[in-house]
């Protein structure tokens, strides 16, 4: 169930391209415009997507990853294993993690069937560096609404905000991946996880038929 919630949630996290980005210092504006741009692209490019579902990787690479804190999220997933990894191991892992996100997020976007969304009203940021933004996803086919909290983090150097995690039903996506990959990290280390991520990233994206 959580895996499905995570995939549905990713439908609204794909941010804007650099040329049309919203105010990078306001995570609420980023979330709002990102959702609108993403849904528009999914709707307008269905012919290309249906002809070649792996085209979704391109959308992810162009529109999402430049505005997601990939390395920060990847380091959180590694936890204690990050500090013990060599620079070469980290570089290989982050490259594999990025390719994994292209496949995983692309597969999530393949679930698009006309969903709509509501974003919580903007709250004062103050001096906060981590801000959760509640998004409610509404399914046109009558499924119950899904309420999610996207975690946005302020870059201490640039002042810009980027998304790095999502919490559904009190469970963090980062925590879920830590639990899912924990045994592999304990037995085969970061190299074993890197190899698995490379394998997963090679899987073809498949479209979910409308139910």
Curated annotation (Swiss-Prot):
The keyword Protein biosynthesis does not apply. GO terms for cellular component: outer membrane-bounded periplasmic space. Pfam families: MlaC. Coiled coil: none annotated. It is found in: Periplasm. Residues 1-21 form the signal peptide. Disruption phenotype: Mutation leads to accumulation of phospholipid in the outer leaflet of the outer membrane and increased outer membrane permeability. It confers sensitivity to SDS-EDTA. Keywords: Periplasm, Signal. GO terms for biological process: intermembrane phospholipid transfer; phospholipid transport. It comes from the Bacteria. InterPro entries: MlaC/ttg2D (IPR008869), Tgt2/MlaC_sf (IPR042245). Interacts with the MlaA-OmpF outer membrane complex and with the inner membrane ABC transporter complex MlaFEDB, via direct interaction with MlaD. Belongs to the MlaC/ttg2D family. Involved in a phospholipid transport pathway that maintains lipid asymmetry in the outer membrane by retrograde trafficking of phospholipids from the outer membrane to the inner membrane. May transfer phospholipid across the periplasmic space and deliver it to the MlaFEDB complex at the inner membrane. This is Intermembrane phospholipid transport system binding protein MlaC. It comes from Escherichia coli (strain K12). The lineage of its organism: Bacteria, Pseudomonadati, Pseudomonadota, Gammaproteobacteria, Enterobacterales.
